[in-house]
């Protein structure tokens, strides 16, 4: 039997009990020339950062952060007060990552002890469901990239998290498009929590959502890393700016001062239509990142859709994204789907009945 099929049962367990089995790495390339590791089309890599922290700290530097908790650990994520910025008017990119993970993790799970945090679930609860005194940090590397549609106006953000515990002999990848209108870390408490603990890489994406606040009054934007800058200074790192000329913006400000535009609402790109394809793009970029991390001169691209288990799992709008990704997957990227409370549009002729 195809070894990938053995792991499809694990995808079903993910929905019910969040546990998975093992998987065989196979595939030999008989070609004389090894297959190169090529960055997928329309994707721009923004960088790779190592987050090696194994114990809680302030989380204001890369060295004091990890992939899952941004250096805060179980205790820090459970605190009712968010970590403070050294300069609240000028937060750093690393402070924004830390606080973004803090906010997004707590947004999807009950962070209170009485609700089960730290005993039933949380960074310190292992894959068998056993709670420990561990703070649950997961050191590793994070690759960040953006996806464009060729127009230069689309900015889908992707973050591929590769834990140091990644098992190259049983490679697995979890796709985590964000829920709601959240940014790239929107699935940190669901997809990342499950995948990273099991030594899987996790491909997070905002799927074209996220705030991306553009201030029309001073022409300032968010960069990809969350910091603020003028549109001109941000350049290609501009997260979103309204498609408007300076003359039109000046005229608009005179009539309607102090207005803001948001990426998901005002991009005029209807990002929802691309949720599935954006999720698939994140999967392709994740395979590139894994090959960049573990490839060699002799074997530049050891991982592909044929030998890597890929589970697409998310919640709400993210649940809709993984369903659409599975529907649109024409190349066999996805092996299993876990969609919790997905946004789904039923056919107009469909009906539902209640009863036994």
Where are these regions (language model features)?
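Catalytic-loop region of hydrolases
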Residues: 33-172, 176, 181-192, 197-201, ...
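Extended charged low-complexity segments that act as oligomerization/scaffolding linkers
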Residues: 256-260, 302-310, 346-356
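Bacterial N-terminal signal peptides that target proteins for export
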Residues: 2-15
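C-terminal motif of bacterial Sec signal peptides marking the signal peptidase cleavage site
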Residues: 24-27
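Gly/Ala-rich beta-loop-alpha elbow adjacent to hydrolase catalytic centers
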Residues: 312-322
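A short, hydrophobic beta-strand element of the alpha/beta-hydrolase
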Residues: 338-340
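Alpha/beta-hydrolase active-site loop
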Residues: 232-233, 238-257, 263-300
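Hydrophobic or amphipathic alpha-helical targeting/insertion segments
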Residues: 31-35, 177-184, 188-240
């Amino acid at each position: 039997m195809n070894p990938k099929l053995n792991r499809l049962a694990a995808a079903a367990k993910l929905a019910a009990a969040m546990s998975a089995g093992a998987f065989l790495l196979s595939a030999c390339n008989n070609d004389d020339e090894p297959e190169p590791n090529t960055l997928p089309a329309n994707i721009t890599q923004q960088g790779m950062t190592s987050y090696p922290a194994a114990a809680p700290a302030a989380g204001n530097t890369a060295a004091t952060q990890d992939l899952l908790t941004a250096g805060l650990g179980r205790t820090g994520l459970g605190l009712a007060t968010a970590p403070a910025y050294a300069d609240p008017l000028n937060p750093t990119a690393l402070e924004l990552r830390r606080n973004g993970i803090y906010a997004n993790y707590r947004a999807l799970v009950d962070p209170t002890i009485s609700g089960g945090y730290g005993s039933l679930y949380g960074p310190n609860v292992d894959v068998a469901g056993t709670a420990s005194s561990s703070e649950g940090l997961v050191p590793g590397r994070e690759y960040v990239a953006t996806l464009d549609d060729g127009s230069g106006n689309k900015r889908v953000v992707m973050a591929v998290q590769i834990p140091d515990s990644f098992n190259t002999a049983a490679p697995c990848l979890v796709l985590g498009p964000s829920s709601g209108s959240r940014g790239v870390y929107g699935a940190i408490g669901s997809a990342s929590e499950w995948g990273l603990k099991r030594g899987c890489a996790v491909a997070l994406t905002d799927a074209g959502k996220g705030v991306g606040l553009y201030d029309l009054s001073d022409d300032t934007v968010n960069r990809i890393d969350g910091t603020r800058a003028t549109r001109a200074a941000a350049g290609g790192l501009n997260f979103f700016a309204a498609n408007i000329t300076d003359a039109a913006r000046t005229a608009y400000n005179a009539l309607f001062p102090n207005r803001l535009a948001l990426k998901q609402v005002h991009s005029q790109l209807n990002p929802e239509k691309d949720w599935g394809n954006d999720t698939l793009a994140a999967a392709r970029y994740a395979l590139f990142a894994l090959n960049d991390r573990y490839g060699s001169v002799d074997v530049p691209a050891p991982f592909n859709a044929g030998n890597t288990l890929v589970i697409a799992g998310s919640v709400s709008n993210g649940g809709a994204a993984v369903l659409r990704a599975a529907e649109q997957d024409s190349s066999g990227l996805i092996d299993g789907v876990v969609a919790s409370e997905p946004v789904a549009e039923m056919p107009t002729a469909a009906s539902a009945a209640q009863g036994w």
